[in-house]
Design a protein with these regions (language model features):
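Short S/T/G/P-rich N-terminal loop/turn motif that feeds into the first structured element of a domain
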Residues: 1-49, 61-64, 85-133
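An amphipathic, aromatic/His-enriched active-site/gating alpha helix that lines ligand/cofactor pockets
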Residues: 59-87
Length: 133
């Protein structure tokens, strides 16, 4: 059964946009080339928010990707760059990536907040705005 991962990150300042985009593009390319990857979608939302949606053959494939290469190097930086960060994972019948509305619903219902050093009021209250597609 395919394993789906959705992440939403919001940069706390535009000053982090260029380095974030470099890591995001490198991580996206890394994901597409990783063992077990079935699909990758990215969304640049409003208010410096960014979404990723990936499908994997199994959760171990996603975890191997997450702990290697560009993605691994980016993760520690996000503690300072982001003021909102959330992630959700689930299994589904098909390998087709869900729409952003379903990804948002899963993030709200099943997601968890990731640690950031300077959380916004939305991060503290666990409010996750709907994506603007």
């Amino acid at each position: 059964m395919p394993f789906i991962s959705v992440t939403r990150l919001r940069l706390r300042s535009a000053r982090y946009l260029i380095p974030f985009m470099i890591y995001a593009l490198m991580s996206s390319r890394q994901a597409r080339r990783s063992r077990g990857n079935l699909g990758v979608k990215l969304l640049r939302d409003s208010n410096r928010a960014f979404w990723t949606l990936t499908a994997w053959q199994k959760d171990e494939d996603m975890r191997s990707f997450m702990m290697a290469g560009s993605h691994r190097r980016a993760m520690p930086r996000l503690l300072d760059w982001c003021d909102e960060a959330s992630v959700a994972h689930w299994s589904q019948e098909t390998a087709e990536l869900p729409g952003w509305d379903q990804a948002h619903r899963k993030l709200v219902e099943q997601g968890r907040s990731s640690k950031v050093r300077f959380p916004s009021s939305d991060q503290i209250a666990r409010r996750i705005p709907e994506p603007h597609t």
